[in-house]
């Protein structure tokens, strides 16, 4: 009896130790996952591997055996200046007389010294003889009817450049102000912000046309990323299509926030990651991002013990076969889809060691109707790369200057980014578009963005 009691005591002790270790393992896995996610949010991602001890010398190798060596072509068009570089009076080595053999050409393309253009509008002011109403003239290049104390203004080209530098290239308002000052235009950071808000108001009809184009598309690719408004957490959303992209900042990342732009009645194809609120667009045909699933498989293969790696390997193999099937004809793809769908069902029925594997398989099964849409519709993307590319510049901007101070600024942020990104997709010069917008005397004269 004493021996049995001792064994029971030993078993209880070991069970307690195993319980503590299981809890510790779960905590370490949570910290690892949190660390991995945090690493993706850093301004400077960590390197993928240790530096090579003897890296290859940068640049192209010399000689014709290493392919064509590119060079800058001579400029086409009129030459603005011609300068001569005559021979020196004598040989710099021995002092001997020099004989001219030929005159060669060298070209240099450079920026001219910055000089702002100052325009004075001579505005005629009159009064109607019949009703006494005051009337004044307006030139096509004017952006305002203000006279008197408000008669000196910064023109639309400079303001459009400022908007493009801040919302398009990610310069802060302060740096944008400094750059414009170097070009001869004095515009404070506050004035740039106010000008952007004024432009944003004029862009409401343009934004509405972008939203309509997004919802009228056959395929929408949405994504969201963390944002800041007034130092508080918010979310930047993007909905990308082949023709237009819409951005908006919201106070959350749920279904209601997504519906601020994407209609809940959208009936096209939605290519998105596995975030659950996207599934509530029940009128849409869904395609979940396979790249996210493959990355998760790679993480599990790297993190899990050897005895638990078979499940993520099976999932990775299944998804890789699906991607490889894109080059097959319609009939062959249909056969592959049926086979892969059956394998997903079998995978869900199997027992899987380790909680993380069970989570992976449960998620895969929940997404089973959205795994292989791209094989049934070849014009559908298999990943949400469009949205990730669309949202990446904004993420860089957030890491540079932190987000927006006010919700009005956040509204301007989304609207300006939508116009700039869509203009690029439409091959429209964004600066020229914003300039023409500023000069439009009425909303009816706003230039079209879509070609």
Regions found by a protein language model. Give the residues of each.
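Short, flexible loop/hinge motifs at secondary-structure junctions
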Residues: 1-150, 222
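Catalytic center-proximal scaffold of phosphoryl-transfer enzymes
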Residues: 16-19, 88, 121-127, 132-451
């Amino acid at each position: 009896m004493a021996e049995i009691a001792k064994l029971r005591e030993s078993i209880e002790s070991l069970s307690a130790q195993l319980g503590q270790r299981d809890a510790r393992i779960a905590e370490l896995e949570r910290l690892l996952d949190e660390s991995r996610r945090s690493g993706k949010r850093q301004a400077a991602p960590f390197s993928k591997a240790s530096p090579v001890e003897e890296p290859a010398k940068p640049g192209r190798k010399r000689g014709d055996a290493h392919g064509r060596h590119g060079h800058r072509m001579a400029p086409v068009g009129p030459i603005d200046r011609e300068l001569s570089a005559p021979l020196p009076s004598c040989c710099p080595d021995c002092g001997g007389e020099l004989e001219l053999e030929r005159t060669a050409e060298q070209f240099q393309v450079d920026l001219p010294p910055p000089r702002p253009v100052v325009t004075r509008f001579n505005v005629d002011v009159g009064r109607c003889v019949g009703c006494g109403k005051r009337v004044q003239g307006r030139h096509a290049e004017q952006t305002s009817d203000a006279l008197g104390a408000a008669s000196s203004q910064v023109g639309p080209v400079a303001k459009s450049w400022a908007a493009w530098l801040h919302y398009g290239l990610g310069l802060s308002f302060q740096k944008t102000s400094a750059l414009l000052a170097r070009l001869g235009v004095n515009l404070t950071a506050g004035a740039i912000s106010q000008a952007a808000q004024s432009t944003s108001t004029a862009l409401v009809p343009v934004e509405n046309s972008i939203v309509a184009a997004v919802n009228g598309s056959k395929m929408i690719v949405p994504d969201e990323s963390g944002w800041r408004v007034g130092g508080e957490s918010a979310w930047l959303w993007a909905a990308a299509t082949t023709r237009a992209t819409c951005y908006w900042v919201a106070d959350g990342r749920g279904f209601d926030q997504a519906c601020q732009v994407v209609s809940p009645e959208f009936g096209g194809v939605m290519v998105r990651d596995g975030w659950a609120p996207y599934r509530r667009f029940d009128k849409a045909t869904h395609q979940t991002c396979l790249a996210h699933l493959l990355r998760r498989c790679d993480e599990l293969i790297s993190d899990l013990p050897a005895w638990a790696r078979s499940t993520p390997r099976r999932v990775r193999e299944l998804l890789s076969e699906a991607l490889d099937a894109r080059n097959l004809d319609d009939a062959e793809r249909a056969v592959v889809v049926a086979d892969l769908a059956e394998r997903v069902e079998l995978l869900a029925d199997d027992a899987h060691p380790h909680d993380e594997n069970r989570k992976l398989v449960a998620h895969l099964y929940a997404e089973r109707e959205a795994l292989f849409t791209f094989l049934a519709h070849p014009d559908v993307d298999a990943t949400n790369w469009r949205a990730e590319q669309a949202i990446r510049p904004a993420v860089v901007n957030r890491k540079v200057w932190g987000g927006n101070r006010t919700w009005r600024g956040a509204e301007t942020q989304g609207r300006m980014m939508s116009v700039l990104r869509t203009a690029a997709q439409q091959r429209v010069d964004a600066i020229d578009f914003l300039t023409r917008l500023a000069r439009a005397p009425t909303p009816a004269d706003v230039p079209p963005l879509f070609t």
